[in-house]
Amino acid sequence: MRLSELTHPNQLHGLSIAELEDVARQIRERHLEVVSTSGGHLGPGLGVVELTLALYQTLDLDHDRVVWDVGHQAYPHKLITGRYGDFNTLRQQGGVAGYLKRCESSFDHFGAGHASTSISAALGMAVARERRGESFKCVAVIGDGALTGGIALEAINHAGHMPNTPFLVVLNDNDMSISPPVGALSTHLNRMRHSAPVQFISDSVEERVKSLPFMGGELPAELDLLKGSMRRLSVPKVGAVFEELGFTYMGPIDGHDIERMVRTFETAHKVGGPVLVHVVTTKGKGYPYAEADQVGYHAQSAFDLSTGKALPSKGKKPPSYSKVFGETLIKLCQQDSTVVGITAAMATGTGLDLLQKAVPEQYIDVGIAEQHAVTLAAGMACEGLKPVLAIYSTFLQRAFDQLIHDVGIQNLPVTFVMDRAGIVGADGPTHQGQYDISYFRAIPNFTVMAPKDEAELQRMLVTCLQHQGPAALRIPRGSGEGVPLLDEGWKPLAIGRGEVLCEGDDLLIVAYGVMVPAAMITAQLLQEAGIKATVINARFLRPLDQALIHPLARRIGSVVTMEEGALAGGFGAAVVESLSDQDVLVPTFRIGIPDQLVDHASPQQSREALGLTPTQMSERIQEHFCLNSKPSLVGQEAPQALST
């Protein structure tokens, strides 16, 4: 069958193993063709091609439910659920999303982007099924990395206490860190244990013992213990863990052997309770460069298929904020042995991979465990260490309670570096870092800041480490401004002090973080229109520099705030509240992300859709304040933005 003719996963039913293997080959070819051109997640999807086909061979996706954890491995799923023709629009504005979205396809049964949610969601579907008296199958597919997440373990614990609820978890183990060898012994034990005769004998013996008059219908504790011990003898050590939690364990099996997986899934569907099928796959399967470097090819920008090398970018770019942070932290760690970098399975994305190589003894990776990472850092701070937790803005929101309960309330000196703060682009609404300003504003004791460029980032990192309390620093995705950097000798900033970058008497612009350079360009455009603006680099969200902002706002009389974050409870709201509390009642226009989601597109396209480019902001400001006439208190509606 030609992949282009596959518009419904049920078309896989009845295909021979050879035909399924040919479909797998076509999926890999299309996957590589598109990702090498447009960029995206590469290794995860290549590793689950056979798993996807084998699983869907045993399901009716018009009725059954499959929840893919995270969703970055679901490109094969998309290719066989009616999106083959549009797959070349992957992660592009208006095109196929890089993750699963319920609004994109009826076969995307649950949306995601963050790890470890699949088991809870699929179990919830199974609970709803049981309550309605229906009979569709519910499956969660989760990777071994995501299984380290607390919510996944909580869901397994819950499912194990529902012995009569049919429910399947497929563990996609592509690391082999928790797997024993896949071999004949495992195959034999698995086949024997789950064969019909063994199941019959086991059930029959138990029923016969319970029927004895003197047993009272109960299995003696000694016999129950013996039965459990005998069961564990036939299960690999990792499987015994799941068996103890109430699951029937099958595996490990070869995740690229379609025939064997089909047989195993068919058997699993017949079990009347929770089942975990342990499948061992190779991340990047079928593309040698991705198999050899599974971390580097997890996700890729556009690359040359023949060499595996990224296509050269247009012009030389300044180093990214992440790289500047990582290199600066290395030097600070070398100067102070109490400084420790912490990541939650995102070392490469945050720049901490540099620290891992340079000063490994001052580096910790806790896995996908954001809540644990925050409280671990709090405990370290109690004992005199200076933990620096580098984490994506969107992932830190998973640990909001820990920020308040374990760090904020106790006023502990923990530094949080929120990478990918603001608009991130093609990963879409699950990954936009638009909420950290709002949620950090609400936590007492925190000092919160954002740099205007990479040099100010260096000074802010030093400021955080010298501060005797919790501090948070937000940095954007992508390259810096190209300003000169110091190799050492960074001076800390005065807490809560902003700076004036240019002066004018017609308008006051107060900008935060990545919006400061854009504010300066906007001020130049306004000056060309005859409007002279004062621009403040706020630097700090908490505490806000009221001594600088209030007198200028009172004198100039018109204020604009700029932020790359949610307007609801954001930086602009902080400025407005501060002015209002001190009876500085001046017209204020807030520019930022309105109350909506930001869909997948390039960062530039997202900013254009949100009205956040300098040209657009200049025009919006002039419209709002009616050029040079008396400012209006009534703002114009923000431009229509990308939303889901």
From Swiss-Prot:
Pathway: Metabolic intermediate biosynthesis; 1-deoxy-D-xylulose 5-phosphate biosynthesis; 1-deoxy-D-xylulose 5-phosphate from D-glyceraldehyde 3-phosphate and pyruvate: step 1/1
SUPFAM superfamilies the UniProt entry points to: Thiamin diphosphate-binding fold (THDP-binding) (SSF52518), TK C-terminal domain-like (SSF52922)
Listed GO CC annotations: cytosol
Protein's recorded name: 1-deoxy-D-xylulose-5-phosphate synthase
Record key words, sorted: Isoprene biosynthesis, Magnesium, Metal-binding, Thiamine biosynthesis, Thiamine pyrophosphate, Transferase
Cofactor names: Mg(2+); thiamine diphosphate
One of the GO biological process terms: terpenoid biosynthetic process
